[in-house]
Regions:
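Glycine-rich phosphate/ribose-binding loops and adjacent secondary-structure elements
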Residues: 39-42, 51, 55-59, 63-132
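Non-catalytic, usually N-terminal nucleic-acid engagement modules in DNA/RNA processing proteins
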Residues: 1-61
Length: 132
């Protein structure tokens, strides 16, 4: 499965919110794994945006008002998390999720990452803490 198929499936379900296709690296992954993973997630987000735009133009799309949420990733590496939050926030999505937490890191690490990331996501848009 890829980003386009993920968005098509969510569209066929008629869901109110579609979550962008992302990669959730294992909690304690090293920087040399997380950096390309986050870059891939951003590329996939752009592809999700294009596919949703295409689907909205089709006459038989169930929910032409479907919202798209981008997912912040970056493991427990604060600098990558902040950079990724800023990158996806610049795309003016319908909402934003923080993913890749509560997957093996300590509660303290999870809260530390949330404290770092949330100020870099738009306050006027919905936000969602995935999997918690």
């Amino acid at each position: 499965m890829g980003p386009e198929e993920s968005i098509r499936i969510q569209s066929m379900l008629g869901s109110t919110i579609a979550m962008a296709f992302d990669e959730c690296p294992p909690a304690l992954s090293e920087r040399d794994y997380i950096e390309p993973s986050v870059e891939r997630t951003t590329r996939w987000l752009l592809r999700c945006m294009e596919e949703l735009k295409r689907l909205r133009s089709l006459p038989d799309t169930l929910n032409k008002e479907q919202l798209l949420f981008g997912i912040n990733q970056g493991g427990i590496l604060g600098d990558i998390r902040i950079r990724h939050a800023e990158e996806i926030s610049a795309l003016d999505l319908d909402g934003y999720a923080v993913g890749g937490l509560a997957v093996g890191e300590s509660h303290e690490e999870m809260y530390r990452i949330l404290d770092l990331v949330l100020p870099h996501l738009p306050r006027e848009k919905p936000s969602y803490l995935m999997g918690v």
